[in-house]
């Protein structure tokens, strides 16, 4: 579960409720969703004992993009959305840490893009460009994903690890991780070779 207070660390508790002799536990460790490059990147974030095996479908490397001036972040992301759409990606998600952050990003993007804000009460999958808080993104997938701000002030420690993993694994083809300030230590090291690193002043 993405909720750190509901995460099942061990299935022993489940077996105490159900008869172990009448069931089996089958770990699902093969991913068919993302490209090999995105899968390698996200496996490093999770640091799980059981590493997900990625079905070989190659694509572009994920990008980790440092925006030094936070005031420029929305404008740069807006331009990135435009490039993704022009390249043929039909669904693009800007994934934020919280509902409040998502609402703020949506308010600043809606004048330049035909964008939808995903909320808790939405019953129908929204197509095109969406802004979504990470806790509502689980189970969804998009051609391109933009992580709004993966700075250490937003994602740090094991409680945030699964949230960042969930956010990044929503991407099918393109993953761009933006950050301001200091990069979260949940992201693979700069010398890992798992992503392209870009700095924008």
Regions found by a protein language model. Give the residues of each.
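Conserved helicase motor core of SF1/SF2 NTP-dependent helicases
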Residues: 1-201
């Amino acid at each position: 579960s993405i909720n750190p207070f509901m995460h099942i660390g061990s299935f022993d508790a489940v077996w105490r409720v159900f008869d172990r002799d009448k069931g089996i536990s089958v770990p699902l460790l093969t991913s068919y969703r993302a490209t090999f490059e995105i899968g390698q990147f996200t496996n490093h974030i999770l640091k799980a004992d059981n590493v997900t095996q990625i079905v070989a479908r190659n694509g572009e490397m994920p990008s980790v993009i440092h925006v030094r001036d936070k005031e420029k972040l929305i404008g740069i992301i807006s331009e990135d959305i435009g490039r993704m759409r022009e390249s043929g990606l039909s669904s693009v998600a800007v994934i934020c840490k919280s509902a409040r952050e998502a609402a703020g990003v949506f308010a600043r993007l809606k004048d330049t893009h035909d964008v939808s804000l995903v909320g808790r009460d939405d019953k129908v999958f929204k197509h095109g460009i969406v802004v979504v808080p990470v806790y509502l993104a689980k189970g969804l997938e998009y051609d391109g994903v933009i992580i709004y701000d993966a700075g250490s002030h937003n994602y740090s420690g094991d409680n945030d690890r699964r949230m960042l993993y969930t956010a990044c694994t929503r991407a099918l083809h393109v993953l761009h991780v933006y950050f301001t300030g200091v990069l979260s230590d949940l992201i693979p090291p700069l010398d890992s070779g798992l992503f392209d690193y870009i700095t924008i002043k």
